A protein has these predicted regions:
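A short helix-loop-beta-strand connector motif used in the catalytic cores of GNAT acetyltransferases and
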Residues: 54-65
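A short beta-loop-alpha structural element at the N-terminal edge
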Residues: 14-26
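Conserved GNAT-fold acetyl-CoA-binding loop/helix
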Residues: 27-52
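Conserved beta-strand-loop-alpha-helix junction that forms the acyl-donor binding cleft
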Residues: 128-137, 156-160
């Protein structure tokens, strides 16, 4: 699909692979997303951790950033996963555009570059989560051909729960 099919590109961003020097901007975007998702206190990751985990010897994630006027204004952060049914996949952890730049086609540009990368890499699936109240995002994803699964539930265990579980099985 042409990119204007989803959101008109009013501002052309430069989309590139993130670099270690982008870590502060990445953290800023993560914090902004947490506020948007009504979880402002949930972010505990640090800039140093982003630098190590994304740009160290063994990166745990990769990221594309959108740059306008030498400012990082958006990102698509993802990491590889493996499906026992399909093979290699990517998980799109966050697709974020800073609030003043939303609705200008920057998210579409990031989404396009991420999916082109997935296509060129040969992954068998990409997946991500979207909050049920984020209707503009849901519409955007559905228009692009993504399927919103109603029958799978997201399951998580935070650090405290992991610690408690391990204590219980080892006592």
């Amino acid at each position: 699909y042409p990119s204007h099919y989803f959101c008109p590109i009013m501002i052309k961003a430069h989309i590139r692979k993130a670099q270690k020097s982008d870590a502060a901007s990445i953290l800023f975007l993560i914090r902004e997303l947490a506020i948007f998702e009504k979880e402002p206190r949930a972010v505990i990751v640090t800039q140093a951790q982003i630098e190590k985990d994304g740009f160290g010897d063994r990166p745990l994630f990769a990221c594309f950033v959108a740059v306008v006027d030498n400012q990082v204004v958006g990102m698509a952060l993802y990491y590889p996963r493996y499906s026992t049914w399909k093979g290699p996949t990517f998980h799109l952890e966050d697709l974020i555009v800073t609030e003043p730049m939303r609705g200008k086609g920057i998210g579409t540009q990031l989404y396009n570059v991420f999916l082109e990368h997935a296509y060129n890499t040969g992954v068998k699936r990409v997946e991500w989560a979207v909050l049920d109240w984020n209707l503009p995002a849901i519409k955007f994803y559905q228009k692009s051909g993504a399927t919103i699964s109603e029958d799978w539930r997201s399951v998580q265990m935070d650090k405290k729960s992991i610690d408690r579980y391990i204590l219980n099985i080892n006592s």
